[in-house]
Amino acid sequence: MTITTDTTLLHDPRRQAALLYWQGFSVPQIAAMLQMKRPTVQSWKQRDGWDSVAPISRVEMSLEARLTQLIIKPQKTGGDFKEIDLLGRQIERLARVNRYSQTGNEADLNPNVANRNKGGRRKPKKNFFSDEAIEKLEQIFFEQSFDYQLHWYRAGLEHRIRDILKSRQIGATFYFSREALLRALKTGHNQIFLSASKTQAYVFREYIIAFARLVDVDLTGDPIVLGNNGAKLIFLGTNSNTAQSHNGDLYVDEIFWIPNFQVLRKVASGMASQSHLRSTYFSTPSTLAHDAYPFWSGELFNRGRASAAERVEIDVSHNALAGGLLCADGQWRQIVTIEDALKGGCTLFDIEQLKRENSADDFKNLFMCEFVDDKASVFPFEELQRCMVDTLEEWEDYAPFAANPFGSRPVWIGYDPSHRGDSAGCVVLAPPVVAGGKFRILERHQWKGMDFATQAESIRKLTEKYNVEYIGIDATGLGVGVFQLVRSFYPAARDIRYTPEMKTAMVLKAKDVIRRGCLEYDVSATDITSSFMAIRKTMTSSGRSATYEASRSEEASHADLAWATMHALLNEPLTAGISTPLTSTILEFY
């Protein structure tokens, strides 16, 4: 067998002519190159249909011819082998194109497409932050924090225990949520958030989730477990039984509103007892009688220390603590008033307007971090704290986010209308199932800037949400307008006319219910607590009889929530909770 060594052109002139034609040569040029007659080449073109051959088929025949020439070449160079490999890959690619033209399946063109949906694919880590995301979070954190918040950050780097007394609404919970997420990502330490109630603890969770979304990370789970290092973000109410088993950095908010704080502190402090962990306590002030005040003042540290050398004296005045101070008991303390926050870059307040909206005493308590002496209050904090419960954990029959949160069980509504621009208060009260049982405040609302019709409409919506059995409304003065509108859709509504005698009856009823521990509301509802604490016993203008009044402030709003609660409680007789000895009944037949 004779093997050709001519690799330039095939010996079949008819095939050579076709390949040259597809390269762009004309019929006369091809005839001259092959030394053939022009009519012969023209005849081949017409008979073989060179023009009708698809472009991909032309390339395939050209590849085949060239590859065949290289394969039968006896002595191949390195360049020949490279070209053979290249041509082989091109033939494979053309084969995929042909399959795609028949099936329309993109996977025939690109094999990687078929691998995209394979089960063996590695799943992305849950709650995972890339290095770039963490860097961006840090940048956002420092750019969006006020100066006084960055002071808290620096203190946290140096001190194990931070104790902060603060004004309302200066962004402490917001800030510490962000700080804790970054600390968990960097250190791997668990972050524990302990609040007055589980509902309040979830405020931390909402802020953390929103912070993570700024870098396109969706955090899920309760607790949230970070995919980077396994650190947990744990959100707890004040149930010490659930708190004691955890370990990590601790954040406790609103400590001056937590009932039985000393019991909780003993358990909670153990969660951050290791030297590399830290504890942060922060709160607005409540009353000097609160359990947390000795912890703040240093009195708790001195208990059991008889020696004068062991005892400490801590100046907890604003002058001493405005800039933050490491005190002798090892705690770093700071007081941040609303004026301090303004100096620290928080320009969200109009202080002069707040002073106009609040009495001098109320402004000092709400915004200047001064404690209230509740000795003159009809309802001292010591009594009210027995009413505070973690409703999310203890009220299993109440679903706050359902269309009908309390099902078909009856509720009572108490309403204190808006007077002269202050807010209107409304409570939804669940009466006890049995005589002498507990009342529960399911909902409370404070509405400001509403006219009579809007106030009445707000009550009407509550009647659609609950099985309302009773509505009590203060119909004194301007309140009569709301009462008349409510009676149009709820004819059984009761109008309550304020007199010294009526106020006394309401206060005595509420006092009895609270004294017996028969009122419950969520521990995070500090506005209810403040509202009751604002009520004082005074004399009427004539000086002939005693009555009950409250300071008028934007926050306590003349104790509207307390009065609204008492309007609802009035549906039960004053003697209903008084236990009476069992008596026998005699039935006579005549």
Swiss-Prot record:
UniProt region (Disordered), positions on chain: 105-125
Q: Which Pfam families match?
A: Terminase_5, Terminase_6C, Terminase_6N
Q: Which UniProt keywords apply?
A: ATP-binding, Nucleotide-binding, Viral genome packaging, Viral release from host cell
One GO term in the molecular function aspect is:
ATP binding
Coiled-coil zones: none
* Keyword check for GTP-binding: no
Q: Does the keyword Cytoplasm apply?
A: no
Q: Into which family does the record put it?
A: To phage HP1 protein ORF16.
Q: What does this chain do?
A: P protein is probably the ATPase subunit of the terminase which directs cos cleavage. The Q, P and M proteins are needed to package DNA into proheads and for the conversion of proheads to capsids.
Please identify the protein, giving its name as recorded: Terminase, ATPase subunit
The organism's taxonomic lineage, starting at the top: Viruses, Duplodnaviria, Heunggongvirae, Uroviricota, Caudoviricetes
